[in-house]
Amino acid sequence: MKIFRIGAAAVLLLAALLAAQAPAERTVVIDPGHGGLETGAKGRFGNLEKDITLAISLKLKALIEKDMGFEVVLTRDRDVDVPMEARSAVANNHKAALFISIHANGAVQKKAAGSETFFLSLNATDEETRRLAYLENNSTELQTRVDPSADNDLMMILWDMAQNAYIKQSSRLAELVQGELDAMLGTRNRGIKQAPFKVLTGVACPAILVEAAFISNPDEEQKLASDTFQTKVAEAIYRGLARYLKAGQ
């Protein structure tokens, strides 16, 4: 008889899958990426990802609360560190209907540009996506990485269950949000992709991660730092969400 050792990550995934049995409330959880000592990516002009993601998230929260009648919960509403496991726990504790994580992209190549939207998968769409997920998952030494290649049968079973539970809804939400980003921002459309982002694991509802633009690209950094562009990003995500809800996904 095989005996499984249940680690913290496995417990988190199992709890999320059990929480999925409960009916979803009219709550949307917005996750402003990074925060506190974990600044995220930094642009040439000194702008920090953590500040941009919070600004966009606050604008999105206001739009949803004003026009949709949903309760909106932020994983952070100020400049503080929030462990990745705690972010997904916020969604599950509030029985969230949707989870949206907001980020600003970064790359070694300063010419890299555009917007893209992700949903969870054990396997990354391509090598660039795998690299991005690795960097996000290892953004601080205080947080551990979920290693899909680990020889742990229980973790693999839970990973499969977690990624399949809401994959159709997450894929559709990502598609609609990305379509609105493309229509409103004028940035390169990098499409929708799948990646093993740790922040999306263990969330017991449809979940996406939005990379609004590249803060490592000086031109896009200036856009990301502007109130006008931040508002457009929030409005694009809002419109994609509205289309998703209207379709009764």
How should each PLM-predicted stretch be described?
Residues 40, 158-249:
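Active-site-adjacent mobile loop/cap segments within catalytic or ligand-binding domains
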Residues 21-154, 163-175, 179:
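Catalytic-core regions of hydrolytic enzymes
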Residues 1-10:
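Bacterial N-terminal signal peptides that target proteins for export
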Residues 12, 76-78, 114, 126, ...:
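A generic, residue-level signal for flexible/boundary positions that often mark functional hotspots
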Residues 11-20:
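Hydrophobic h-region of N-terminal signal peptides that target proteins for export
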